[in-house]
UniProtKB/Swiss-Prot annotation:
Residues 9-244 form the ATP-grasp domain. The lineage of its organism: Bacteria, Pseudomonadati, Pseudomonadota, Gammaproteobacteria, Vibrionales. ATP binds at residues 46, 53-55, 99, 102, 107. This is Succinate--CoA ligase [ADP-forming] subunit beta. Pathway: Carbohydrate metabolism; tricarboxylic acid cycle; succinate from succinyl-CoA (ligase route): step 1/1. Mg(2+) binds at residues 199, 213. The keyword Nucleotide-binding applies. GO terms for biological process: succinyl-CoA metabolic process; tricarboxylic acid cycle. The keyword Ubl conjugation does not apply. It comes from Photobacterium profundum (strain SS9).
Amino acid sequence: MNLHEYQAKQLFAEYGLPVPEGFACDTAQEAFEAAGRISTDKKVVKCQVHAGGRGKAGGVEIHDTKDGVKEFAQKWLGKNLVTFQTDAKGQPVTKILVEEASNIANELYLGAVVDRATRRIVFMASTEGGVDIEKIAEETPELIHQAAIDPLVGPQPYQGRELAFKLGLVGDQIKQFVKIFLGLGNMFAQYDLALLEINPLVVTAEGNLLCLDGKINIDSNAMYRQPKLREMHDPSQEDEREAHAAQWELNYVALDGSIGCMVNGAGLAMGTMDIVNLHGGQPANFLDVGGGATKERVTEAFKIILSDTNVKAVLVNIFGGIVRCDLIADGIIGAVEEVGVKVPVVVRLEGNNAPLGSKKLAESGLNIIAATSLTEAAEKVVAAAEGK
């Protein structure tokens, strides 16, 4: 789960980290009033969406007047912002962040991720702030400095000082950086974060550090024990189909192809997508119905797949272990009858009660194409999607 910039800065402030004074606004009038409460002559206004590249897309501007701030809010609230990280539809703008402008002398980068190889939280810092860190890692990796956090003792001041020295910070800036480093390290562990970025972490003209932007991603598997962060969830930023799938405990990711896939098990789902691609098709989605598939969940899975107008055929690939193939067959039949499936459906069942499931499908009288192997299923669904 991702947080908006204003939400990330709220968490930063709770840990005593320096952030610009700002207000998240739902209406243009609120933005106008917020601009009046900010002491600096210039105000920065930012569209709040879960995507980067807002500035280049016109979603970040600097204004000298309250009226300019209000006009910006009127322009964007209720609209979609399209950036290089969104699809063609873009992300809806429901909040505008109005905050004080800062005099920037230097831009740094500070971020943290979970390194699965070392099983540690690893901090990354660089003098190249304000740009894409992946680009820096690829072109000039020597400019990225790291510090691994021992989970038994947590972040240590000496690690913060080492990073500060490598970033060229001096005097009181080192003390400020250590405070930021320790706060972020404790926040990362307490809130079960998966990724944290301050890009840029700026040195102001007065020589102080300031968290000018914030990006936070939370481990979705830990949301059950993070009620505070759950309340920050913004469903408007998610794909509607993915949000619908999550309500039914279905793992769904929308893609750009024309062949809908419904599979049980993430590994088998990825293998199914690969073999569809190998035979010249393009998957329209990743969908794992899981081991506890029921007739109702299978029906909902069909509805979600078919809500994508690009889908020309559907491949159902089930290996019955925990889930029984005859129950999947009941779900397929019920879904086809309820939804009124107009596209070809190719089904491959294997494992627990597969013969009974195949028999039910054959006796249903529905236009369902049976396949006995994964290769055969891929060939048939690709041909069906092409109208052959």
